[in-house]
Every structure is written in C-alpha cells, then in structure tokens.
C-alpha cells in the first residue's frame, strides 16, 4: 500500500468513527502533531478525534486528491460534520516513518456558500 493510500485510509477510518483502529494500524507510537487545539502528543489528538466522532456521528469525509513525495504525503479533502452543515476544505500533511504516520499538520477553511471564483475550492 502506498503511503498516500495509507493517509487516505487513516482519514477515512478516523472520520468514520474508527479512530482507535486508524491509530493502531497507521500511527507511529512516537507520533506528534501541530493542531493548535490539542497538546502535541499522540494520545491527546486521538481522544479529540474520538470526541469529534461522538459529537458528529454522521460526519462525511472525502479525499479529493493526495500527493506523495518521499516520506511526506499531502491530502486535500473536505468534511461535512452534519448532513446540513457546510463543507469544510482540509489539507493534511503527514510525515511517515516506514508505513506509519509520525507527524501531522493540518489546515481547514469553511467553504463559503457563494464565491466569485467560478473554479470552486475543489
């Protein structure tokens, strides 16, 4: 399995509420992240993702594209927390050690209902 496929599968499982399974399969024990809302360790983000899965059980995640360059993978995607909520555009950058995610960065932006840009965000 290519690293970009691992990254997409990790996000799919986590967004679908299978956070522990995603972590057990794909996240290195020495994982660290750069999400400003949680401590930078593995366990704090895992717990935050589990809490999100409980709060938003109908969450929809779609990976739009993924790029792989050496030990780095970038996934451009979108998530909808509830069926009637707006889409949120996401970028995740993962650094791998072997076939496990060891570091992660992310950025998110709500998709505006109207935009002068005819190309859209995706």
What role is predicted for each listed range?
Residues 1-122:
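C-terminal and inter-domain tail/linker signature
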